Amino acid sequence: MVATGSLSSKNTASISELLDGGSHPGSLLSDFDYWDYVVPEPNLNEVVFEETTCQNLVKMLENCLSKSKQTKLGCSKVLVPEKLTQRIAQDVLRLSSTEPCGLRGCVMHVNLEIENVCKKLDRIVCDASVVPTFELTLVFKQESCSWTSLKDFFFSGGRFSSGLRRTLILSSGFRLVKKKLYSLIGTTVIEEC
């Protein structure tokens, strides 16, 4: 609901005349709508819900990385920059805020880019009871100056034998690609962070 104020049609005097003293000060206020002076209070339930949703999304991303480190990445440790998953979760919530079902309609594909090669890590369905309305593709990036390289793991058969002693260092940068599934135009939004 949007409340707007306007001068009543009964009063033909201009605002400048009213302000210059053409009438007494009380009449000016009575001509404007009450809602122009009321500031809406923040809904604390929404703020708490958004923070909880953000933290749940952070946990889902961290679980995805944890599961993938030995099964798909073949390493013993994944070092994640401080607040990276928090920033990603906030961006995901922002991108889902304009969708008909919000985050519930999201399917997220999580990938890792190493030396221009993308490795699929996981697929996260935010709410299986809702038909997806959009897809997000999250691309983590390996730290470019890191001393470890996992290129050998992707192209060799023995990734578990030698790889479990290695550490993967993630960059603080990431890419989010949003694709609307219900749009006839097929709108795609790419954000590089």
UniProtKB/Swiss-Prot annotation:
Tissue expression pattern: Expressed in heart, skeletal muscle and testis.
Induction: Up-regulated in soleus muscle atrophied by disuse.
Location (main, coarse): cytoplasm
Keywords on record: Cytoplasm
GO biological process annotation, one example: negative regulation of signal transduction
Pfam families named in the record: RTP801_C
Localization terms from the record: Cytoplasm
UniProt GO cellular component terms: cytoplasm
Keyword Cytoplasm found: yes
Keyword Transport: no
Similarity field: Belongs to the DDIT4 family.
Purpose of the protein: Inhibits cell growth by regulating the TOR signaling pathway upstream of the TSC1-TSC2 complex and downstream of AKT1.
Protein name from the UniProt record: DNA damage-inducible transcript 4-like protein
The species this protein was found in: Rattus norvegicus (Rat)
